[in-house]
Every structure is written in structure tokens, then in C-alpha cells.
């Protein structure tokens, strides 16, 4: 791949605060939200200001979910920030995604309120100065485009989150259009990397079993890209830090660098460099203090506390509702999650746990493991107390797993649920999800 250097940030979820971020309904909503609505503008301004001062890196790429939920005023305010960044000398390339059009809302007087949203068709004109306005090719149906990034490098922006096709799908028509652009680039001796809002490769193994966490038919899409000389794809959507490799049956490799939400934990963005020797360097940068962190509070901890609490809230709210015995069991489960200790769970399952886990509240462990997965470089590898405990739990339920695995199988790819779960909580890939180097083809 030819040399190129740029900043990568995604899922900015800009929200225009004048629309309404107050009241009981807002506070209740934020209990389960990973990222900040109130403060998103300050976070983005802070990061853009930092990027604008880097005179050696002049390209900025943002693969989708630019606004909170398609609010027209949020788009207008975010575009002003993009223009300010562009005036500092940056070339900016964006794509839009599902949160950039459709139903929009805000909060006022303790209630949810509807606010003016944005039509998908309007996004073309709104963001024309940030990518597709000067594109070599533009697909009207999806807003995908091919752009000349440097003299010898092109970027294929695949938008598979449009209103004109199933979300997360790269259908045959779009694939044929992409193939045409890739063939033209090859004929012009240009390297190509891809951006797509949806991950191409599941960010963690267990996401292969979860819908809407990666493109549909991801192996087919990954094979198509790898076998058409694309080695690098940059993605978002899942608000997670991950780097994964895929090899096609022809032996061609695709690297998917998925980046977290900018305005919420883990609050990261990337600096990507491919040098003259085709060495890909992925560097992760912290959002850090943006001027809205309470005095005396560490910025990263401020972000992480919001995420940990949101994970626990989502788990406990899932235990609400039901009827009869189901409602009663859910109520007991919710109380156990909120007040129970890991050691008690171990005794119930007849498994021996490490001393470091016995007195840990269950809700704290849930928050810690969830945060670790989304931050990347998951620490619960072989030999750690959590890994050992999970192995014992999986062994205890092995009879259930054996019955479930065949039902989870997709095509010829067998499902090993134990390995999936262990490799989801522990990074066993041999490289970091945050800072890594790869040798690409020259």
C-alpha cells in the first residue's frame, strides 16, 4: 500500500444542546446511555482543536453516526465545526449512517419531545464539502463514493446504512459498483483502503452471533474486499476498540480497525500511518479533559463511570417485566445482580473462585468486564481469576452448550461457544486492539 497518514474518529453523535437536555426524562435516559449528549459539542470542539494544531497530518476521516439521532440542528452545528476544522487546512471525509436521519428527539420539562429531523436525501447536499462533493464516483442510492486521498491512494467509502437497503447490508448491486471502482483504481496504480460504518469483521468473537454488530454476510463481504486488493478497512458503529484480521480462502488478508465512540467511554480516536515501506501503524489517542469534567475527577474515569453504570442499568432493566413466576424470578435476579456478591454465585454453582473475586459485587464485575471488552486489549486471559472462573462456569454448563452450539452454526462454520466467550473477554490475538503495527503489501 502506498504511503498515507490521517486521523480517524467515528460515532461523534453530536447533539445540539439547545434542543433540550434537562429534566427527569433526560436523567432517566442517560442512566442507560454509554455516551454523553450533554457535553458532546465540547468534546468534539476539544478534539478538533487538538487535530487542527497538527501541521503534519492533514486528513481527517469520520465513518458515520455524525449526529445523536438525525436532529437537523445537530447536523447544522456539527457542520459548522467541520468547516472550522477544514479552515485549519484539513481535508475531511465523512459518511453518514443510521443515526444521521430519521426520528429525532430531545428532552424538556421532564418529557421526551420530538424535534425536527433530517431526511436521508438531504444529507447529500449537507455534507457535500466533506468527501463526496469532489468524489471520483458517487452512488446516489447509498451515498457511497470513491475519493482520491493522495496522489496514489484512494478511499472507498461504503455506506451500507442507507434507507434504500437493509441496514448493514452490502448487496450485489453495491458490490458490483464497488468492484468497478476498485478495478479503476488498480488500473490507475492507486492503492485503496475502505471506510464503512458497520464493522466488516465482528469486533469480538461473540458478536458473530449477535445481529447488527457487523455487516450482513460478513465473510462474503470480507472475502470480496480482500480478494480485490483491499487490505485495510476502517469502521465504527459498535463503539468498541478492536483490530481484527481475516484471511480469504485465496490467502488474502483484510485488517478491520474498528474505533470507539468519540463522545463516550472508552473515548478514543486514532492516528493511522502507512509509511514508505508499507508498514501500517495504528496509534490510539485519548479524548481526555474537554473542559466539562468535574473538578478533581480524572477525565477517563469520568467517561468510564458513565459506561459502567449504563451496562449495569441495561442488565437490570432487562430483568423488569414479565408475568407470574417469570416476573417473580426476574425480580429475584435483579435483586441478586444489584446486591449479590460473586462468591455467592460461586457457591450456587458449586465452583471455587479466587479470593480476589469472592467479595466483589456482581454489578461491579459486570461493569468491569463490559468496559474491558469495549476498551480493547481485554485482560482476562488464561491464568487470570476471571478467565479461570469463566472456564469453570462453562464446564458446569457444558451439557447445555453442546445442545446450543448446533443451533448457532451458520453454514459450514462450526460454533465453538467456549472459545468464542473466552476470546471475547481475553485478547489472545498476539497484538493490541489499540496500538499495533502490520506489514502490508508493497
What are these regions (language model features)?
Residues 1, 294-442:
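Non-catalytic terminal accessory segments
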Residues 1-72:
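N-terminal active-site segment of His-dependent metallophosphoesterases
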Residues 1-7, 16-18, 142-157, 187, ...:
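Beta-strand-turn-beta hairpins that frame and shape the catalytic cleft
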Residues 11, 60, 65, 78, ...:
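Divalent metal-coordination and catalytic microenvironments
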Residues 13, 66-67, 98-101, 199, ...:
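Catalytic metal-binding/acid-base residues of hydrolase active sites
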Residues 49, 53-59, 91, 154-156, ...:
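His/acidic metal-ligating clusters that form di-metal
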Residues 72, 76-177, 250, 271, ...:
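Extended active-site neighborhood of metal-dependent phosphoesterases/phosphodiesterases
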Residues 283-294:
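Short, solvent-exposed aromatic-acidic interface loops
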Amino acid at each position: 500500500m502506498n504511503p498515507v497518514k490521517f486521523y480517524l474518529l467515528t460515532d461523534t453523535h453530536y447533539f445540539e444542546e439547545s434542543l433540550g437536555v434537562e429534566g427527569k426524562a433526560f436523567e432517566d435516559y442517560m442512566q442507560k446511555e454509554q455516551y454523553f449528549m450533554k457535553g458532546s459539542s465540547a468534546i468534539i470542539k476539544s478534539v478538533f482543536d487538538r487535530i487542527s494544531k497538527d501541521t503534519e497530518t492533514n486528513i481527517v476521516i469520520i465513518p458515520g453516526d455524525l449526529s445523536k439521532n438525525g436532529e437537523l440542528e445537530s447536523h447544522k452545528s456539527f457542520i459548522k465545526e467541520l468547516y472550522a476544522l477544514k479552515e485549519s487546512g484539513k481535508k475531511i471525509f465523512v459518511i453518514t449512517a443510521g443515526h444521521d436521519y430519521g426520528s429525532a428527539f430531545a428532552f424538556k420539562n421532564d418529557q421526551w419531545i420530538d424535534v425536527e429531523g433530517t431526511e436521508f436525501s438531504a444529507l447529500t447536499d449537507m455534507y457535500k464539502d466533506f468527501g463526496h462533493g469532489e468524489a471520483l464516483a458517487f452512488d446516489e442510492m447509498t451515498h457511497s463514493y470513491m475519493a482520491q486521498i493522495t496522489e496514489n491512494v484512494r478511499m472507498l467509502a461504503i455506506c451500507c446504512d442507507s434507507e434504500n437497503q437493509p441496514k448493514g447490508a452490502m448487496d450485489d448491486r453495491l458490490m458490483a459498483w464497488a468492484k468497478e471502482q476498485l478495478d479503476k483504481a488498480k488500473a490507475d496504480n492507486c492503492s485503496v483502503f475502505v471506510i464503512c460504518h458497520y464493522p466488516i469483521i465482528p469486533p469480538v468473537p461473540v458478536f458473530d452471533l449477535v445481529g447488527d454488530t457487523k455487516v450482513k454476510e460478513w465473510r462474503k463481504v470480507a472475502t470480496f474486499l480482500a480478494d480485490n486488493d483491499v487490505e485495510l478497512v476502517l469502521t465504527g458503529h459498535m463503539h468498541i476498540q478492536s483490530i481484527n484480521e481475516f484471511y480469504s480462502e485465496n490467502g488474502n488478508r483484510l485488517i478491520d480497525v474498528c474505533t470507539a465512540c468519540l463522545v463516550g467511554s472508552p473515548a478514543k480516536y486514532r492516528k493511522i500511518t502507512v509509511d514508505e515501506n508499507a508498514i501500517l501503524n495504528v496509534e490510539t489517542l485519548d479524548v481526555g479533559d474537554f473542559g466539562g469534567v468535574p473538578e478533581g475527577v480524572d477525565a477517563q474515569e469520568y467517561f468510564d463511570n458513565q459506561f459502567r453504570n449504563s451496562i449495569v442499568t441495561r442488565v437490570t432493566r432487562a430483568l423488569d417485566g414479565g408475568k407470574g413466576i417469570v416476573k417473580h424470578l426476574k425480580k429475584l435476579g435483579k435483586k441478586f445482580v444489584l446486591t449479590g456478591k460473586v462468591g455467592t454465585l460461586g457457591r450456587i454453582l458449586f465452583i471455587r473462585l479466587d479470593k480476589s473475586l469472592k467479595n466483589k459485587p456482581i454489578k461491579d464485575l459486570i461493569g468491569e468486564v463490559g468496559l474491558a471488552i469495549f476498551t480493547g486489549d481485554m485482560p482476562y486471559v488464561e491464568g487470570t481469576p476471571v478467565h479461570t472462573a469463566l472456564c469453570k462456569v462453562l464446564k458446569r454448563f457444558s451439557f447445555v452448550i453442546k445442545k446450543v452450539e448446533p443451533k448457532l452454526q451458520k453454514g459450514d462454520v462450526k460454533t465453538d461457544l467456549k472459545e468464542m466467550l473466552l476470546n471475547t473477554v481475553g485478547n489472545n490475538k498476539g497484538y493490541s486492539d489499540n496500538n499495533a503495527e502490520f506489514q502490508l503489501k508493497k
